[in-house]
């Protein structure tokens, strides 16, 4: 059975755990519609991505 040779220090343990935190999703305001959307994602209401029409506009 594998056993560690040395005790993991609190500093090293903390550095290992630093990547475990769940981060809140970021949102940006769309330039065209003013709606909030995820960065690098298309706007589902308008169907625009990077200034181009990729999907048909959602009729609601």
Swiss-Prot record:
One of its GO terms (biological process) is translation. Residues 1-60 are annotated as: Disordered. GO terms for cellular component: large ribosomal subunit. Residues 17-44 have a biased composition (Basic and acidic residues). One of its GO terms (molecular function) is structural constituent of ribosome. Coiled coil: none annotated. InterPro entries: Ribosomal_bL32, Ribosomal_bL32_bact, Ribosomal_zn-bd. Residues 1-16 have a biased composition (Basic residues). Keywords: Ribonucleoprotein, Ribosomal protein. NCBIfam families: rpmF_bact (TIGR01031). Belongs to the bacterial ribosomal protein bL32 family. This is Large ribosomal subunit protein bL32. It comes from Rhodopseudomonas palustris (strain ATCC BAA-98 / CGA009).
């Amino acid at each position: 059975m594998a056993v560690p040779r040395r005790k993991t220090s609190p500093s090293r343990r903390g550095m290992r755990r630093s990547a475990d935190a769940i981060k809140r999703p970021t949102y940006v305001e769309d330039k065209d519609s003013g709606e909030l959307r995820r960065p690098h994602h298309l706007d589902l209401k308008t169907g625009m991505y990077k200034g181009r029409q990729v999907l048909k506009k959602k009729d609601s």
